Amino acid sequence: EELIYNQYHFNYYLVNPALAGAEPCSHLMVSNKMQWAGMKDFPMTQLLSFKTRVWENVGIGAYIFHDRNGYTSKAGGQITLAYHIPLSRGRRYSKKVSYDRQLSFGASFKFSYFYINDQLFIDDPDAMQDIAFNNTDGFLPNANFGIYYKSYGGFVGLSLTNLVPLAADIYGDKELPAPFTGFLFGGYTFDLGARKDKYLEPMAMLKMNQYLEVNMDLNLKFGHDVDEDWGYWVQASYRHCWNVNNIQAMVLQPMCGFRIGKFQLGYAFSLALNNLVTQNYGTHEIMLGYTFCYQKHFCR
């Protein structure tokens, strides 16, 4: 499973390339995720992403990441080109382009590089003689495609990833190709209050791969735009996995975020409802973002 997809709560572009430039803002984000904190050599993932609109109907996006899990590491990235078709003449956010109703398409080229850390051979010199470690790295390209539609408060997206069934030659053998996977999500933003400075956003996401392994996320977010200088949001999320081999079959994830000027700060905590609960302190994620223009609510 691509670890970065689990960070979509802070940036929907991570699961759907059509989100590149879909919102009236340019967004830069850096995040750090620590899984199963408290256990030795717990996994850790760092991510840097950017998305913006460069012309009236064209958006671009990119991210790079690094993941460490024990002696193995993975690095990679993605570059995206998206096209947005306005479907209304509203002027809610911009004097030039309408973002109220919009249909977007996006395609990405992505790549991953796998390698074994040298620390393995320091801790276990005999590993140098193991033929399984004759080839300790591998490069794997792939592609994604996505569609995104928004109509005022409603939004829905469909994306397909790992479109090319390529396998990396690593650990002395061919690895299985990354599974062809689809994401379907949808939600609605309800404006609340006389000034409509508060909002409630229910959202659901369904993920399924070619092996019929299914994840379903149910999310409920509440936000308050106190003024143009700052705001906050809180969210409760629940994930259920229809895959008996997934040790995170059920996951609870509360999270919160703040907007201070053009800066955005977010924190998420995940707790898997399984036997590992008593052996670790859950998964922690911190996000810092910056928007280059004012965007009502949180930039998807």
Residue ranges and their predicted role:
Residues 1-300:
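Subset of outer-membrane beta-barrel
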